[in-house]
Amino acid sequence: MRLFHDASYRFIQARRKAYVVSGIVLTAGVIFMITNVLNTGSWQNYGVDFTGGSLIQIQVYENLSAADLRDALSGSDEITRFGEESEFVVRAPVAEDGSIGAVADEIETQLAAAFGEEAFDVVRTEQVGAKVGGELQLKALYAILFSFLLTLIYLAIRFELRFGMAAVIATLHDIMITLGFLAAFRVEIALPTVAAILTILGYSLNDTIVVFDRIRENMHKKGARKRDPVDLVNQSINETLPRTILTSGTTLAVLVALLVLGGAVIRDFTVVLILGVIIGTYSSIFVASPALIEIQNRWGLGRAGEKKKRPQPATV
């Protein structure tokens, strides 16, 4: 991309402004999470996969609203519009010792009694036990934490410990902002959403490694130890900028097409991925690289994880 071929942007010098922006967004996300806990008892909008219960997607053939369906079900179930105006999703929790099949059958029976069997069709049904839902929550958390651990170990071996720490900071930044977004807009957390979060983690890490690899390459060039580390990191970011813009741009183009044409079933999954690509691109430039500078300035952690006695200027 010739537009950024000879770029010389001073990204690291703008890191404090980026810290402010990230801090504001992260704080807003935490506030939304706390608000959700106070209002609903849960910091996220967990789907049936994680809470247990029954989910029934129905298509109605009469001019029925969510309020009409709620009245037919005695107002005890959560009903939301899904995709087209004639499609709704009914969610009903189930007790630990309850029958999830009985709950789904009861919902269909009540709707048929109120509107007639020809007034609607059941498009799909999902049923998850409460115990299984709790186990899935725990396993999803383990998956994310385990990915952080593997990231740190891999980068500590492949690069140095400080690179691994900086990458984990950037990835944690991306995940927290994504969770804040999900909390703010009450996006349902289901298994596809967790898959999207793990995909974000991988995409963000890939962007970060590309920049870190160029930093390491420039560190080994002749005369690098006499250079200001900030200038060296800026040069590395600028050299990888065309690749970053092209990769993120083409990925976003595909995801936008998927969002427009993919339908409501994968809408939340696609939205989370779009957000993740944008945040991952931002963090690889304004979070990971500045974090590497800050870690080096404060602790100078090298491959063995020990503070160097006399760090050289270009040992970023």
Where do the language-model regions lie?
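A structural signal for conserved, well-ordered secondary-structure elements
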Residues: 1-316
